[in-house]
Swiss-Prot record:
Short motif 'KMSKS' region, span: 292-296
Descriptive protein name: Glutamine--tRNA ligase
E.C. no: 6.1.1.18
Reaction equation(s) it catalyzes: tRNA(Gln) + L-glutamine + ATP = L-glutaminyl-tRNA(Gln) + AMP + diphosphate
Top-level EC class: ligase
Residues reported in the UniProt entry to bind ATP: 42-44, 48-54, 237, 285-286, 293-295
Annotated positions binding L-glutamine: 74, 218
Superkingdom of origin: Bacteria
Source species of the chain: Xylella fastidiosa (strain 9a5c)
Gene name of this polypeptide: glnS
GO BP terms in the entry: glutaminyl-tRNA aminoacylation; glutamyl-tRNA aminoacylation
Record note on quaternary structure: Monomer.
Pfam families, per the entry: tRNA-synt_1c, tRNA-synt_1c_C, tRNA-synt_1c_C2
Keyword set includes Acetylation: no
């Protein structure tokens, strides 16, 4: 697994976004001597491109400042979580090129969180409430009206402690009681109106089994897990800005650094005891046009079979982007290019595509392929003519070496490279016209062969024998150059032409009554059967090529093999989407 280390990061130009400036100041003032961050996904789905920004920031910051980053599975909602999602998350983080200092689960800390909740009860800072969820919403109030205190808000600490322990013992059914923080029902911040800290949920947990009939709420568990792990800077997106006062309330009132007895369960697990007073810092989330990133909507796309699974190359999951042919380097370049700020904005999808083009232009070997093949027969060559031509694997990188490519009397060319009635400015083949065959010589079309329906099925032509490589006529000027594949040697391949999943910039915009389902791009996937040169077929899955003049393609991660090649188009050679 490739890693982004501190050494790698420091070789890069210094980044000066506001988060890194805060960290530099904290280090300079002695607030912290060692930086610790975390990436805390919930294992209830696959990571998407928005998570890539958080991953690059969390792990990148730690590496740049010589610290470390923890990968924590936020597994507090077992009814929606699955070990398969947890495994995919680890795979995605590794694929992006990052290595976690430790792998943790919020469930590792359930005993500590329970003891912390008992402390809050004893301190008079939490109470057991008998209101159901609908009543809680009613009592909470609105943005313009203060909330009302629960009838059970003034229970004594002893009664609350007894009830909470009964909740822990599994005495009560789901939804009948919650443990709530006692903060301020009149607060202008609704998150501080006595939020729930624990709820009853008799659900088996993937890691703890049936040990726990109660589970901590996100805000409580997240804040204290950061504190338990000694996190110095808890980086999250802007929608959590209003949750920061609650985050600080949990951290400060439990006060783990000064209540080390609460950490005793960590000793049994062999975990370090390095509690901190973490600081939450918010940054803008990643928004890209032509996409949806809501987990609910992505799930609907899969469940309704509008796409072919979570790793469909049209999906914006990291699994899907990887299968499409996006590289870790391109993803990291994209995150670096869009930067880190507090201002929400929508990034044009072309920025992501250009990062991939830039990366693949440097690393992808060149190959020839035809996706809409048309046969060209060079009638002045012998029927058994065969020779091996030498081509560079990359025109700008001699270190990638060369390959041999067979050349024969019958070739496959691209159907779009011939026109009987050419438009103005046409530079490719026409009846009686000439074109250069890449690396092979200059050819002319003498005859257009059609079937009974009038469809063109072949071209017959002539290869100028004086224009072969190394001959003087090879320098003769012609207007166009086209690619080709030797027909007897070509390998048939399935080629999947992927494009953007949605046809409009804002698929989430329902102002015209249409939902994201109504604006799916009908041409987001086309499957064609073409021909590739032999050197392209004999390669492993997830290997990228530039098919000359066609775009960047990758061997499919799951379906490709040498006997039955399958290629996915990762991105076109240039941006073909017209902006409004």
């Amino acid at each position: 697994m490739s890693e982004i280390t501190s050494t790698d990061a420091r070789a890069q130009p210094e980044k000066k976004d506001f988060i890194r400036q805060i960290i530099r100041e904290d280090l300079a003032h002695g607030t912290h001597t060692h930086i610790r961050t975390r990436f805390p996904p919930e294992p209830n789905g696959y990571l998407h491109i928005g998570h890539a920004k958080a991953i690059c920031l969390d792990f990148g910051v730690a590496a740049e400042f010589g610290g470390h980053c923890t990968l924590r599975m936020d597994d507090t909602n077992p009814s929606k979580e699955d070990p398969a999602f947890a495994a995919a998350i680890q795979d995605d983080v590794s694929w992006l090129g990052f290595h976690w200092n430790a792998l943790r689960h919020t469930s590792d800390y359930f005993e500590v969180l329970y003891l912390a909740a008992e402390k809050l009860i004893t301190d008079g800072k939490a109470y057991v409430c008998d209101l159901n969820s609908e009543q809680v919403r009613e009592y909470r109030g609105t943005l313009t009206e203060a909330g009302r205190p629960s009838p059970w808000r003034e229970r004594s600490p002893d009664e609350n402690l007894e009830l909470f322990r009964q909740m822990r013992a599994g005495t009560f059914p789901d939804g009948t009681r919650t443990l709530r923080a006692k903060i301020d029902m009149a607060s202008g911040n609704i998150n501080l109106r006595d939020p729930a800290l624990y709820r009853i949920k008799h659900v088996e947990h993937q890691n703890t089994g049936n040990t726990w009939p109660i589970y901590p709420m996100y805000d409580f568990a997240h804040a204290l897990s950061d504190a338990i792990e000694g996190i110095t800077h808890s980086l999250c997106t802007l929608e959590f800005e209003d949750h920061r006062p609650l985050y600080d309330w949990c951290v400060n009132h439990v006060d783990l650094p000064n209540n080390s007895h609460l950490l005793k369960p960590l000793l049994d697990k062999g975990f370090p005891q390095e509690p901190s007073q973490p600081r939450q810092i918010e940054f803008s989330r990643l928004n890209i046009n032509y996409t949806v990133m809501s987990k609910r909507k992505l799930t609907a796309l899969v469940d309704e079979k509008l796409v072919e699974g979570w790793d469909d190359p049209r999906m914006y999951t990291l699994q899907g982007l990887r299968r499409r042919g996006y590289t870790p380097a391109a993803m990291r370049l994209f995150v670096e290019r869009i930067g880190i700020s507090k201002q929400n904005s929508i990034i044009d999808f072309s920025v992501l595509e250009n990062c991939l083009r830039e990366n693949l232009d440097t690393i992808a070997p060149r190959r020839m392929a035809t996706i809409a093949p048309l046969k060209l027969v060079l009638t002045n060559l012998p029927e058994d003519h065969e020779e091996q031509l030498i081509f560079p694997n990359h025109p700008k990188d001699d270190t990638q070496g060369t390959r041999t490519m067979p050349f024969s009397r019958e070739l496959w060319i691209e159907r779009d490279d011939f026109s009987e009635i050419p438009p103005k400015g046409w530079k490719r083949l026409v009846p009686g016209g000439e074109v250069r065959l890449r690396g092979a010589g200059i050819a002319r079309v003498d005859e257009v062969v059609k079937n009974a329906a009038g469809d063109i099925i072949a071209l017959h032509g002539w290869l100028d024998p004086t224009s072969r490589p190394g001959m003087e006529g090879a320098h003769r000027k012609v207007k166009g150059t086209i690619h080709w594949v030797s027909a007897p040697h070509a390998v048939a391949a399935e080629i999947r032409l992927y494009d953007r999943l949605f046809s409009v910039e804002k698929p989430d915009d329902n102002t015209d009554g249409k939902t994201y389902r109504d604006v799916l791009n009908p041409d987001s996937k086309r499957v064609v059967h073409g021909y590739i040169e032999p050197a392209a077929a004999q390669t492993a899955p997830e290997h990228a090529f530039q098919f000359e003049r066609l775009g960047y393609f990758v061997t499919d991660r799951h379906d490709h093999d040498a006997a039955h090649p399958v290629f996915n188009r990762s991105v076109t050679l240039r941006d073909t989407w017209q902006r409004d």
